[in-house]
Each structure stands twice: as structure tokens, then as C-alpha cells.
């Protein structure tokens, strides 16, 4: 796992994104100092952002630390919303994007994976965003039905991208 994390710190990756991907990097927020204390916030799935409401949702796990989330949110001007979640075996869900995705008009969430005491506040916050809440169960979560991404084309149309396995688990 250390080798994986080291690979993610290479500045060449940012240069490649700029040169080959056409992305501009205007700011780099380096939270890697937390790794020395064993605290992580893996960038690709630990946090699901609601850009419209400026809320950063994070399912706490060994890969997602609440203190690092708080620092990220303070730097970005987002409200942190941390919660716990487990799979069907009681194991902590490792990344938030396994159970939650947020699009313009809808949200996909596996609320049954969240402890009862945290479920109502989470659902209330998601509903307050004005989006339709689409509930999935733990079996659908295990098939990555919560791991979806809304993409926008140049003409403004949107599509919801997900794996064939995820799509096959919707009714």
C-alpha cells in the first residue's frame, strides 16, 4: 500500500494531466503530511462532493480520516459531513463513492449501510439538496451500483456513467 501511495505523490502525474489531458492545475493542496500519523483521505473515492450545496460527504474508514476531511473542507470552503457505514458482513465501507453518488437532479445512496442514528441526518441533508434520492440496498452497493458519475457533454446533455455490473443491479 505504501508503494501505491508514493506513486500518487509524483508531480509527473500533474504534468501529464496538464499536457496530455488538457487539464490546468491552478492549486495544489498537499495533505500528505497526515500519512506520517497514519491518517489518510484517499482522493479518488473517500469524499463525494456536492458542489452545489458545498458539502463534502465522507464515510469514515481506515482510508478516510475525519481530521484530514475537516482540513480539506476548511481549505476548500466546504461543510464536512462524515458518517460511518458497513457492508453486509459488518466491515467498514472503504470509500464513500461505493455507497453514494451525487448528480444534478438525483442522488444514489445505500442508507441501510449507515447506522440508524446517522441515517436520518444523512438522508435529511441529501433531501435538503432538492435532488431525488434513489435508495439502493447493500447487495446493490456490493455490485457498485452506488459508484456512478454524472458526465456533461459539450452540448450540456448529461449521462450517468456506471459499470455494466452496477447497471445490471438496478430494477
Language-model-derived ranges and their functions:
Residues 1-171:
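The feature marks the mature, well-folded catalytic cores of soluble enzymes
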Amino acid at each position: 500500500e505504501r508503494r501505491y501511495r508514493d506513486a500518487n505523490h509524483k508531480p509527473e502525474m500533474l504534468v501529464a494531466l496538464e499536457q496530455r489531458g488538457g487539464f490546468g492545475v491552478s492549486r495544489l493542496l498537499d495533505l500528505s503530511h497526515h500519512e506520517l500519523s497514519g491518517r489518510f483521505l484517499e482522493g479518488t473515492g473517500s469524499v463525494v462532493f456536492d458542489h452545489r450545496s458545498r458539502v463534502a460527504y465522507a464515510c469514515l474508514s481506515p482510508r478516510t480520516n475525519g481530521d484530514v476531511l475537516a482540513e480539506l473542507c476548511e481549505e476548500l470552503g466546504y461543510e464536512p459531513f462524515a458518517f460511518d457505514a458497513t457492508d453486509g458482513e459488518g466491515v467498514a465501507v472503504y470509500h464513500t463513492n461505493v455507497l453514494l453518488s451525487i448528480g444534478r437532479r438525483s442522488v444514489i445512496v445505500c442508507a441501510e449501510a449507515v447506522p440508524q442514528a446517522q441515517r436520518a441526518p444523512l438522508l435529511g441533508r441529501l433531501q435538503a439538496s432538492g435532488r431525488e434520492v434513489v435508495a439502493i440496498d447493500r447487495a446493490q452497493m456490493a455490485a457498485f451500483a452506488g459508484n456512478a458519475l454524472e458526465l456533461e457533454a459539450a452540448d450540456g446533455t448529461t449521462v450517468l456513467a456506471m459499470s455494466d455490473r452496477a447497471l445490471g443491479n438496478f430494477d
